[in-house]
Regions:
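Auxiliary alpha/beta "docking" domains used to position bulky ligands
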Residues: 1-186
Length: 186
């Protein structure tokens, strides 16, 4: 399970990050449609600073191996098409969720409180029973204690945070793609 213990000072906060979800060039489809996304997501710099231990949990996906694997079954398929379909899949998100839940289960130290910042949008209500977030209906969040904020939704610049840790990201990803989550303990 890949994770790094980091310092609070490694975490790069910037309120402008919350505007990345909605600007003239891009609008995330979850912006304004989830209790855990901007504009509803709170800026959590002060809250996060009250915690004492921080772990960046991540999943690294080997894109080259993935392309080779797909090409073995579909030799005529172009690399661009393989990568395009990869980004549309929830594969990495599911892998990171597994890593985060494993890390939390295996964490042995005592703590009073825990804050987990996931990747992407909150998916707690994306299940057969609930089907969707209540945000658009105007009803309150069904599971306020289980709400999943992403690092970006609360104002963390993930790219700068990762750079602070000397992890090199490729844009666009050619060899490896990453997903990150942050687990904080008091």
């Amino acid at each position: 399970m890949p994770y790094i213990e980091i310092r609070y000072s490694d975490i790069s906060f910037d309120p402008k990050v919350q505007t990345f979800c909605h600007n003239p060039k891009f609008k995330c489809p979850n912006y304004g449609h989830s209790w855990a996304c901007p504009p509803e997501a709170p800026y959590l710099e002060k809250v996060v600073s009250s915690f004492r231990k921080f772990y960046l949990v991540y999943y690294q996906f080997d894109l080259k191996s993935y392309v080779k694997q797909i090409k073995a079954n579909h030799p005529k398929r172009k690399e661009e098409k393989i990568l395009g379909s990869f980004y549309a899949k929830a594969l990495m998100r599911d892998y990171l969720e597994t890593e985060l839940l494993s890390f939390i289960d295996e964490y042995q130290e005592d703590y009073e409180e825990r804050l987990v910042l996931w990747d992407g949008y909150c998916r707690v209500c994306n299940n057969p029973k609930d089907k969707y977030c209540t945000y658009d209906s105007g009803k309150p969040c069904r599971y306020p204690d289980k709400k999943r904020y992403s690092m970006e939704a609360v104002g963390i610049n993930v790219n700068d945070t990762v750079k602070n840790l000397q992890i090199e990201l490729e844009w666009p990803p050619l060899n490896y793609a990453y997903r990150f989550g942050l687990v904080c303990f008091k």
